């Protein structure tokens, strides 16, 4: 696999209910550049770590770091230390990217290279029904 342009770092702790949706939304992104996903199992006491390992076994773009609980900042920092890409995206394990989100972010960054790229979001309940949306 060639060096990724974008790495998505996901801290994982007690995320069994949401992890598959999160990772699927990452690995299904259509991008012109290679992407990677780093799942940081932050000492989760449930089977979230095993779920991370299963994703890594299925998709070579997914890697897993297992560590003792260091909190979300410690997990993000571990992911940053392991990433070797030009761009970093942080995603929480209960989040999901919309189709095309990574390519849109990459395009926006390249149009304005000294900028921070942010995008809109939708808050959903457990049944994934939209509740609120951020302004575009």
Which positions does each model-derived feature cover?
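Nucleotide-sugar donor-binding/catalytic module of glycosyltransferases
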Residues: 1-136
